[in-house]
Amino acid sequence: MVINSELFRSSNSFQEEGFESVTNGLSFSITEENISDSVILTTFHDFTNWIRLSSLWPLLYGTSCCFIEFASLIGSRFDFDRYGLVPRSSPRQADLIITAGTVTMKMAPSLVRLYEQMPEPKYVIAMGACTITGGMFSTDSYSTVRGVDKLIPVDVYLPGCPPKPEAIIDAVIKLRKKVGQETAHEKKNYQQSQRCFTMSHRLKPVLPIHTGTYDQQTLRRTPGIEMDTSLEYPLERILQNSIETSSPFQDSEEIGLLKDWKQSNQKQEQNVKMMKEEEA
């Protein structure tokens, strides 16, 4: 409440203007025309909204280069303390999280856990192209989440690669306006039905490429006939010695490789003979 200084006038001033001095406060009923400059009328919800928008505490969360732009706000050049922003390192003391940087599939459960540990009401600002859509990793990356809104609800989207500190301040101002316009009905429905906590995406599942067995193929373990003819020591004898010195758990595998090598060499020899006959 703001009280106008004109109400604090002495008794002499009232006598000069023709008002009778009174001692009982109940009979003092002076209504001024400019009452709007003297008293502020508001509701309890607007008052609490004003308190919350003036004390947003962001969580320090950064996974990529966008966090460098966010960290520059702490300096004296931009000074985001004037907006009531106090950076916190614990999610239990924060009500705002700015997801600055790329969100990977491995980091997604940790991000959801941080969001769930934040007390209500809580807000999210998606900062950067990588956070909003996956950015340059959205085409052929198997480990990047295509938008953080697949994991947690987002209140303000801040595009850029990376966004400037002035853009971050503008996003905070827009979030402050949203907080100031919230009603009591909206506060009771924080858990909206649109919020989805999932890691699903539109990528098609494919078989794993790096299975560890690519070097166990016959063509990679046994060279061709050209290399066999260039060696002074027969390659078949080398493989036989390796089978004798190997462990018993690998005998069947090595024997199978040796048989495959013999069959492949026989096929190569037949192909060479056929080519020579055709040339003749």
UniProtKB/Swiss-Prot annotation:
By sequence similarity, the record places it as follows:
Belongs to the complex I 20 kDa subunit family.
EC number annotated for this UniProt entry: 7.1.1.-
Which proteins does it associate with, and in what oligomeric form?
NDH is composed of at least 16 different subunits, 5 of which are encoded in the nucleus.
| Role | NDH shuttles electrons from NAD(P)H:plastoquinone, via FMN and iron-sulfur (Fe-S) centers, to quinones in the photosynthetic chain and possibly in a chloroplast respiratory chain. The immediate electron acceptor for the enzyme in this species is believed to be plastoquinone. Couples the redox reaction to proton translocation, and thus conserves the redox energy in a proton gradient.
Q: What class of enzyme is it?
A: translocase
Q: Which organism is it from?
A: Staurastrum punctulatum
Q: Which positions are annotated as binding [4Fe-4S] cluster?
A: 65-66, 130, 161
Look up keyword Ribosomal protein and say if it applies: no
**What biological-process GO terms show up in the record?**
aerobic respiration; electron transport coupled proton transport; photosynthesis, light reaction
Positions of region (Disordered)? 257-280
Record gene name: ndhK
According to UniProt, the name of this protein is: NAD(P)H-quinone oxidoreductase subunit K, chloroplastic
Cellular component, GO annotation: chloroplast thylakoid membrane; respiratory chain complex I
What PROSITE patterns does the database record attribute to this sequence?
Answer: COMPLEX1_20K
- Please share the entry's free-text remark on the cofactor: Binds 1 [4Fe-4S] cluster.
* Annotated keywords: 4Fe-4S, Chloroplast, Iron, Iron-sulfur, Membrane, Metal-binding, NAD, NADP, Plastid, Plastoquinone, Quinone, Thylakoid, Translocase, Transport
What's the protein's topology in the membrane?
Answer: Peripheral membrane protein
Q: Where in the cell is it found?
A: Plastid, Chloroplast thylakoid membrane
Cofactor(s) it depends on: [4Fe-4S] cluster
What this protein catalyses is: a plastoquinone + NADH + (n+1) H(+)(in) = a plastoquinol + NAD(+) + n H(+)(out); a plastoquinone + NADPH + (n+1) H(+)(in) = a plastoquinol + NADP(+) + n H(+)(out)
Which branch of life, at top level? Answer: Eukaryota
- Which molecular function term from Gene Ontology is one that the record holds? 4 iron, 4 sulfur cluster binding
